[in-house]
Each structure stands twice: as C-alpha cells, then as structure tokens.
Amino acid sequence: MTFSNNFHRLETRLQSQAGRAIGDFKMIEDGDTVLVCLSGGKDSYTMLSVLMALQKRAPIDFKLIAMNLDQKQPGFPEDVLPGYLKKVGVEYVIVEADTYSIVKEKVPEGKTTCSLCSRLRRGVIYRTAKELGANKIALGHHRDDIVNTFFLNMFFGGKMKAMPPKLATDNGDHIVIRPLAYCAEKEIAAYARAMEFPIIPCNLCGSQENLQRKKVKEMLLEWERQAPGRIDNIFSALQNVVPSHLADTDLFDFNGLTTGLAKIGEEALFGQTAYDQAPLVFAGSHDDRIEFVRFERNPAGKAPEGAEQPAA
C-alpha cells in the first residue's frame, strides 16, 4: 500500500495528538495492560493503529489486548475482525455474548436501542478486562464525540458535563481512557479511508441513531461550516473553565467573597476575552503622577450649587 505525503502528515498528526492526550491525562503508564475495544468502526480501528505505533517508540512498557464483542446481531461478519487482527499481529480476544436478543426483548420495536445496548456491552467489557488482568480500557471516542456529549447534557440534561478523557469505573477496578480525545472526527475518517480498514456497519441491529444526538451533531457541523475552527474552540473551552464566571456554588465560593483582599485577579473580575465588555479602568489607577482622585456625590434631586433650577 502506497501512501502520499499528505497521508503521512495526517498519520503523524493523529499519533501526536493521541500521544499528547495520553501524556496530559496519564492515560497509559509503565506496566499497564490496555484492553483496546474494537467495534469494527473507523474510530476504534484508528485508535488501535495509533496505539500500536506509539507502543513501538514509547519510553515505557505496556501491553495491548484488542477485544471485540460479538453481540450475535444477524449478519455480523464474524471472520472480519479476527482476520484483520491476525494480520496486524496484535494479541486479541473475541467475546461472544448475545446482548442482541436481550435488547430486542426489552426495547419496543422502532425505539432506539443504543442506551440499553451500551450498558450491556459495558458490563461485558468490564468483566473481560478483569478476567484478562487489564487495568486500562481504551475506547475510541474522539474530540467531536466529547463536544457533542457536552451539548446533549446541556440542552437535554441541564448539566455542563461532557465525556472525560479518563475516568475510573464505578467499582474502581479499572480506568477508562479515550486516547483520541484530541483528534477530529473528519481526520479520523480520512485516515480510515486511506488505511482501507474493513469497516463493519454499526446499524446491523436495525436501531436508528438517537435523534437528539443526530440533531446536535448536525448543529455542530453547520457551525463548523459557518466558522471553521469553532469545534476546536469549544473543546478548548472545556479545558479552560473559569468557575468564578459560572453559577455553581459547589465550584466557587461566592458566599465567601468579601471586600478587601481580592480573591480573584482584576483580569478575572473585568474579563479579557474577546466577547467580554471592555475592562473598567479607574482614573489614576495606572498613573503615578496622580496622587488623589476625587469624586462628587449628588444627592438625589438636588441640583449642584449655582445651577439653574428646572422650571416648575
């Protein structure tokens, strides 16, 4: 397979972004065993490819085990992933669990099955990780997924909550990591096309994409068309939170604010971002030649001395 210079730049960029995310959040450490979850989609294929490349030159030792869950969906091509994983030479496990029948039994026809399917799949993944001795579980969610989830939670859940690059499972047994957290979906898609990954469609179950998620995704794509770079800016905002400029009393001690010694800087008080109002500059505050600044107070309704009184 011959690749262009553009492809090599793309590959380098994805590896660099994943490496930076791994470093920023300490996703992978020396001695880790990482269970790499493969669905057969573009994101998980790209994640495995990037992790294998980083593993070869990493200054630490860690183990990768690829995992695919065969959920017994009708038409699922059972030989595709084993064939690919043997070809690339990575240790792997195929887990068979008929979650498909459970989902079809529990969810009414025509309804979205993704939520229940995800919960069942998560349980199988956690159990498999424990059996294999894997302390890290790698998922293929990317930057766009994180931003999309942020708006879903804000619009429909009333929370400023996204999808964290790293988190502990509820029982504390494993750490879930998302190495593609800094990677854009369009670049992952371009990489997957160039690599000619054997993609397995995600709609074999017959479920429709969640309507709310679809609408938010369309909204973000339209924003990106109108103002390229907007998704990048939104993701950057998730990394630059200013609790004093929100309204969550659990994040910032508003009740503890007092006069006297400032608890936040003047820049934070008056703002320095592009869409804040211009900072208020007090007369004389930046000029040592002015020793005293006087102001006059005019009691309500009283005209200054010597001024003409208004006509009755």
UniProtKB/Swiss-Prot annotation:
Which SUPFAM superfamilies does the annotation name?
Adenine nucleotide alpha hydrolases-like
Task: Name the chemical reaction catalysed here.
Answer: cytidine(32) in tRNA + S-sulfanyl-L-cysteinyl-[cysteine desulfurase] + AH2 + ATP = 2-thiocytidine(32) in tRNA + L-cysteinyl-[cysteine desulfurase] + A + AMP + diphosphate + H(+)
**Pfam families linked:** ATP_bind_3
Transmembrane domains' residue ranges: none
Where on this chain is PP-loop motif (motif)?
39-44
Which cofactor(s) are needed, names only?
Mg(2+); [4Fe-4S] cluster
The note filed under miscellaneous reads: The thiolation reaction likely consists of two steps: a first activation step by ATP to form an adenylated intermediate of the target base of tRNA, and a second nucleophilic substitution step of the sulfur (S) atom supplied by the hydrosulfide attached to the Fe-S cluster.
- What is the purpose of this protein? Catalyzes the ATP-dependent 2-thiolation of cytidine in position 32 of tRNA, to form 2-thiocytidine (s(2)C32). The sulfur atoms are provided by the cysteine/cysteine desulfurase (IscS) system.
Q: Name the family the entry cites.
A: Belongs to the TtcA family.
Q: How is the cofactor bound?
A: Binds 1 [4Fe-4S] cluster per subunit. The cluster is chelated by three Cys residues, the fourth Fe has a free coordination site that may bind a sulfur atom transferred from the persulfide of IscS.
One GO molecular-function entry: 4 iron, 4 sulfur cluster binding
Location (main, coarse) = cytoplasm
For this UniProt record, give its keywords in alphabetical order, as a comma-separated list: 4Fe-4S, ATP-binding, Cytoplasm, Iron, Iron-sulfur, Magnesium, Metal-binding, Nucleotide-binding, RNA-binding, Transferase, tRNA processing, tRNA-binding
The residues the entry assigns to the signal sequence are none
Q: A Gene Ontology biological process annotation?
A: tRNA thio-modification
- Give me the residues that bind [4Fe-4S] cluster, please: 114, 117, 205
- Compartments, record wording: Cytoplasm
* Name of the protein in question: tRNA-cytidine(32) 2-sulfurtransferase
Per the UniProt entry, the Enzyme Commission number(s) are 2.8.1.-
Could you tell me which NCBIfam families the record lists for this protein? Answer: PRK10696.1 (NF007972)
Domain of life according to the entry? Bacteria
